[in-house]
Amino acid sequence: MSQLALDVGGAHVKFSDGLAWTGSIPWPLWKSPDQLAGRLRTILASAEDCTAVAVTMTGELADCYPSKAAGVNHILASVCEAAGRLPVRVYLTDGRLVSPAAALAAPILAAASNWHALARLAG
């Protein structure tokens, strides 16, 4: 494995290496957003040979965040904290994979990006 894809949703965290290692953990983000980094750290610790992380999200829409931008900010901070030194890329709805800093500059493009990633692959 080299890339690990994470989809941080409001009720589940899904992950895959795109080959054989895949999973989904039921987890209501809105109940304990402060535990997101720890949850992600556990997933990353089980990912053998992971050298980079790519992320999509819908969890920024959870009721625990006052706005989409606040949710994107918290989710990306949690992903980066969990990833440590691993490079993190964020999928945007314009089809680009960008750094967390670039995604934070355009949080609406990072918000609810998983549907676009799937549509792009299917199309």
Label for each model-derived stretch:
Residues M1-G10, S16, W21-G123:
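Nucleotide/phosphate-binding catalytic cleft detector across ATP-hydrolyzing
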